[in-house]
């Protein structure tokens, strides 16, 4: 459908011909009239290995600088990289391409680009090919996309397809690439709600660049179909190019794999740690590795591609058995994958992602645990942090990673410990699951393996090993980890908000929010634009509408002598709706009335104090705990606030003290709170993406709030200076989910009240113990020690009592077919006490014990000695039947079982039933 898009003067004027690949069927452009294939792997093997494409070798830094300088010299502005965690997006977690830096606001035309045209080298992370990493020789989870972008509008074109191709060809020519070796393959592109024609730039089997011409947007009514979606033309159109930095370096060196080209030192180090040096020094192995590398383009593990079949293709081409090739290649491929994954982790953790079970943290843990699993397979015992440190030493252009290394190291050590615990626990979980499927004669299904990984972190390889010992089969696709990564790489799509009374509001103008301009003003006049039910819409307001974790203002709206309480304020697409309480059932305000509004001062100031304090506590936590701290959520109340922080371990009491101290110092410095509206792009360039701690607000301009050293995009109400907040008191902290710590605190009068409450508790506790408050810790420690001693003594006495009861019970036991039967109600005994007696009696091989108690309903315990079990008596069956009589249930093992019920009036009936069952068993025996 896009064929005409590729009929360009660039191709016609430079000797290109359009052909169709005889292998994949795709169309491509080439200067070589004899060429019949598109040049891409697997249609063509890697022919640059051992025969570099460029006139000289480049390392990563040199290639990056060459590219950026090339485009700077041709009118492009160089931009610094964005983080690999997409803080400015709420639809994706990771930066997957350079264009993601400018979505959605720039690409949609809402916001102007930071420069036009521009060039950037953007580190990216993609996990959709996770299982191909290490195997194909070319796949990476973490890569840098060198790019140049031009943002065009109808009537204001910077440049489009012709010049983009000219620049690409000129770049390759400057690197002395053989022009007859270059193919431009037609491949429509779609992603992120946009699409357009695209050409892939391929040299000697290797795709070096992708040139996307984004001019389409998703449209259900659109007439352009691409990859199953319908699109229509955009008003703006964008040059979106991506040049693979690592692939350019690889092409310049002609190394066997991209990993050898990028990380030769780390690959050699890991080969040594894995005990694979002999393979590298063996001529036969070296030849096999080289031949495999040329054909590794086949090894693209996907949903449709089976690993064994791919391996067979390569083995057949080399002329050896697939088993021998697998034995040689699998350990080497794991070394390559570990090398790649650890660089990916360097960027993830270095840019502030905390491993967890949700969002970007889930993806970091996915990569991390896959790495640890492969290291375990190769018996590499070096700490993960040491390998990450090697990468950091190789990347001096990222000094922020060196600065963050102590935190990165701490995170990795913590995660390794968690992984080992998971493996221990996971073995038991798999055994239980496998036992279930053994009974049904089934294999463990993929859905169960996915659940085991998602909920417990148990890798499918481990499930396969453990289940095999039980005789249960496990099968999972070769691209299992890619599937998992794909499931979690995007934020859940938000349900479209159902706007109440949308029809009524859509014709109204946006409400002027005057509380931003005059934050201390609480009384105002406004014109009523609409009234319905108990809702009022005004032309302007000083009432803050609920948002950003801050509750709405309350107060009054009056007309003449009639006063209504404002109980809620909400905003719907810019229109603010005031909800009032109508005691008499009728609202006596009409459209066009001029009302007087009064905001409740106490509530406004209390919430403003807590909101401003939230900024201060967040900043203090970042200074104490590290730059990785990120606000995962916040909610303000009148009596306290809570702040959820991404952090990899519990915040210690000492750290909390430091955070509280720093926060109060900021208050006492009485710094002015500065608010200003700034163009989004300018704000991002000045302050970075820490702006979006509280979420990503829409619009070309965003409101910036500076509180001390904290700078955020924020729409809430704040104090005019930090001194107005008053004291800040941290009340408690808890771990609400893996990787997230919740800090609760109070500010101002609420903090004073919280401290008074704590003081009252101390005073009351001191009175109870008859000591001064300052002696409370010593006294509590002494009393606790005495309590523990008394508890031990109590336990000892209980054991003595149990033993004495045992002797008495044995004396009172009845004889039955060579067995002794104890059947007794023990008044006031709890389950533990009954269990101790039964366990003691269990030492007698020929004793059957039936015990009951009426404590808190009915407690039942039965024990059966070894000889009694041989007679067919089962404690579990006894308790089950006895429990039915007292209105309950129970069970257990043949030797010991527990149960109970709710009807103590039938205890004797239950004991009698137990005795009957023993007699029946003895008769049958």
UniProtKB/Swiss-Prot annotation:
Gene3D superfamilies hit by this protein: 2.40.30.130, 3.10.310.40, 3.30.54.20, 6.10.250.550, Bira Bifunctional Protein, Domain 2, Threonyl-trna Synthetase, Chain A, domain 2
Annotated Gene Ontology cellular component terms: cytoplasm
Cofactor binding remark: Binds 1 zinc ion per subunit.
Alphabetized InterPro entries for the sequence: aa-tRNA-synth_II/BPL/LPL, Ala-tRNA-lgiase_IIc, Ala-tRNA-ligase_IIc_anticod-bd, Ala-tRNA-synth_IIc_core, Ala-tRNA-synth_IIc_N, Ala-tRNA_lgiase_arc, Ala-tRNA_ligase, DHHA1_dom
Short name of any one Pfam family annotated for the protein: tRNA-synt_2c
Chain positions recorded as Zn(2+) binding sites: 611, 615, 714, 718
Cofactor(s) the record lists: Zn(2+)
GO biological process: alanyl-tRNA aminoacylation
GO molecular function ontology, one term from the record: ATP binding
Subcellular compartments: Cytoplasm
Keyword terms, alphabetized: Aminoacyl-tRNA synthetase, ATP-binding, Cytoplasm, Ligase, Metal-binding, Nucleotide-binding, Protein biosynthesis, RNA-binding, tRNA-binding, Zinc
Domain of life: Archaea
EC number: 6.1.1.7
Catalysis performed (reactions): tRNA(Ala) + L-alanine + ATP = L-alanyl-tRNA(Ala) + AMP + diphosphate
Enzyme class (EC, first level): ligase
HAMAP family hit by this protein: Ala_tRNA_synth_A
Protein family (similarity comment): Belongs to the class-II aminoacyl-tRNA synthetase family.
Record's function text: Catalyzes the attachment of alanine to tRNA(Ala) in a two-step reaction: alanine is first activated by ATP to form Ala-AMP and then transferred to the acceptor end of tRNA(Ala). Also edits incorrectly charged Ser-tRNA(Ala) and Gly-tRNA(Ala) via its editing domain.
Domain notes: Consists of three domains; the N-terminal catalytic domain, the editing domain and the C-terminal C-Ala domain. The editing domain removes incorrectly charged amino acids, while the C-Ala domain, along with tRNA(Ala), serves as a bridge to cooperatively bring together the editing and aminoacylation centers thus stimulating deacylation of misacylated tRNAs.
Protein name: Alanine--tRNA ligase
Organism per entry: Methanosarcina acetivorans (strain ATCC 35395 / DSM 2834 / JCM 12185 / C2A)
Lineage of producing organism: Archaea, Methanobacteriati, Methanobacteriota, Stenosarchaea group, Methanomicrobia
């Amino acid at each position: 459908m896009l064929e005409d898009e590729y009929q360009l003067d660039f191709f016609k004027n430079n000797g290109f011909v359009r052909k169709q690949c005889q292998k994949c069927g795709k169309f491509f452009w080439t200067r070589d009239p004899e060429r019949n294939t598109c040049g891409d792997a697997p249609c063509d093997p890697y022919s640059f290995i051992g025969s570099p494409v460029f006139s000289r070798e480049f390392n990563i830094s040199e290639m990056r600088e060459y590219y950026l300088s090339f485009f700077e010299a041709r009118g492009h502005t160089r931009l610094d990289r964005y983080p690999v965690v997409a803080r400015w997006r709420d639809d994706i977690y990771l930066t997957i391409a350079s264009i993601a830096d400018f979505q959605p606001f720039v690409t949609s035309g809402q916001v102007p680009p930071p420069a036009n045209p521009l060039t950037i080298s953007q580190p990216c992370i993609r996990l959709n090919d996770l299982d191909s990493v290490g195997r194909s020789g070319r796949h990476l989870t973490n890569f840098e996309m060198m790019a140049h972008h031009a943002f065009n509008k109808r009537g204001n074109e910077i440049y489009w397809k012709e010049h983009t191709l000219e620049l690409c060809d000129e770049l390759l020519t400057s690197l002395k690439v053989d022009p007859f070796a270059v193919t431009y393959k037609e491949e429509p592109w779609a992603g992120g709600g946009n699409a357009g024609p695209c050409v892939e730039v391929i040299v000697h089997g290797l795709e070096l660049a992708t040139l996307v011409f984004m001019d389409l947007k998703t449209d259900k009514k659109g007439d352009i179909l691409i990859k199953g979606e319908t699109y229509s033309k955009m008003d703006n159109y964008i040059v979106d190019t991506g040049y693979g930095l690592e692939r350019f370096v690889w092409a310049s060196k002609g190394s066997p794999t991209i990993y050898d080209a990028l990380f030769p030192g780390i690959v050699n180090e890991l080969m040594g740690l894995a005990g694979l040096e002999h393979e590298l020094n063996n001529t036969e192995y070296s030849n096999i590795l080289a031949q495999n590398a040329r054909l590794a383009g086949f090894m693209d593990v996907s949903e449709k591609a089976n690993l064994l079949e791919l391996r067979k293709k390569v083995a057949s081409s080399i002329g050896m058995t697939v088993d021998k090739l697998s034995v040689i290649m699998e350990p080497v491929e794991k070394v390559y994958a570990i090398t790649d994954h650890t660089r990916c982790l360097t960027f993830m953790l270095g840019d502030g992602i905390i491993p967890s079970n949700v969002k970007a943290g889930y993806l970091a843990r996915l990569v991390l645990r896959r790495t640890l699993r492969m290291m375990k397979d190769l018996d590499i015992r070096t700490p993960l942090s040491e390998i990450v440190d090697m990468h950091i030493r190789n990347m001096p252009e990222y000094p922020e990673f060196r600065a963050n290394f102590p935190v990165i190291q701490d995170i990795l050590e913590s995660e390794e410990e968690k992984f080992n615990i998971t493996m221990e626990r996971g073995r038991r979980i798999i055994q239980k699951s496998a036992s279930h499927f053994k009974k049904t004669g089934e294999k463990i299904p993929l859905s169960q393996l996915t659940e085991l990984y998602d909920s417990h972190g148990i890798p499918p390889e481990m499930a396969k090993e453990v289940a095999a010992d039980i005789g249960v089969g496990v099968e999972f696709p070769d691209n299992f980890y890619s599937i998992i990564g794909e499931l979690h790489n995007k934020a859940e799509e938000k349900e479209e908000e159902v706007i109440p009374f949308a029809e009524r509001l859509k014709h109204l103008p946006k409400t002027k929010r005057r509380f931003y301009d005059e934050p201390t003003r609480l009384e105002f006049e406004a014109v009523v634009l609409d009234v319905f039910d108990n809702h009022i819409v005004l032309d302007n307001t000083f009432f803050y509408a609920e948002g950003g974790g801050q509750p709405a203002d309350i107060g009054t709206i009056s007309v003449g002598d009639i006063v209504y309480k404002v109980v809620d304020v909400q905003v719907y697409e810019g229109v603010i709706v005031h909800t009032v309480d109508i005691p008499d059932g009728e609202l006596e305000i009409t459209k066009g009335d001029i009302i007087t509004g009064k905001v409740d001062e106490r509530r406004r100031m209390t919430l403003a104090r807590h909101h401003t304090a939230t900024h201060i506590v967040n900043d203090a936590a970042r200074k104490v705990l590290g730059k990785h701290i990120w606000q995962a959520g916040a909610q303000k109340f009148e009596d306290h606030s809570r702040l959820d922080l991404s952090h990899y371990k519990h915040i210690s009491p000492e750290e909390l003290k430091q955070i509280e101290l720093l926060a109060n110092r900021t208050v006492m410095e009485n710094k002015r709170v500065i608010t200003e509206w700034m163009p989004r792009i300018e704000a991002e360039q000045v302050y970075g993406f820490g702006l979006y701690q509280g979420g990503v607000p829409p619009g070309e301009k965003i409101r910036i709030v500076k509180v001390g050293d904290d700078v955020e995009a924020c729409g809430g109400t704040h104090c005019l200076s930090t001194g107005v907040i008053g004291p800040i008191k941290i009340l408690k902290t808890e771990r609400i989910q893996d990787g997230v710590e919740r800090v609760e605190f109070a500010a101002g009068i609420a903090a004073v009240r919280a401290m008074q409450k704590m003081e009252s508790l101390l005073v009351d506790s001191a009175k109870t113990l008859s000591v001064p408050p300052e002696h409370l810790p010593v006294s509590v420690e002494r009393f606790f020690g005495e309590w523990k001693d008394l508890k031990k003594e109590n336990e000892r006495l209980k054991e003595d009592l149990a033993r004495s009861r045992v002797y008495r019970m044995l004396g009172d036991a009845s004889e039955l077919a060579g067995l002794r039967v104890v059947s007794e109600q023990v008044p006031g005994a709890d389950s533990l006490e009954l269990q101790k007696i039964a366990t003691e009696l269990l030492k007698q091989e020929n004793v059957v014990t039936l015990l009951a108690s009426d404590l808190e309903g009915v407690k039942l315990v039965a024990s059966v000695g070894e000889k009694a079990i041989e007679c067919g008596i089962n404690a579990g069956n006894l308790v089950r039947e006895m429990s039915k009589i007292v209105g309950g249930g129970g069970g257990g093992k043949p030797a010991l079982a527990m149960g109970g019920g709710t009807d103590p009036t039938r205890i004797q009936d239950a004991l009698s039933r137990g005795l009957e069952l023993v007699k029946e068993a003895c008769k049958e025996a």
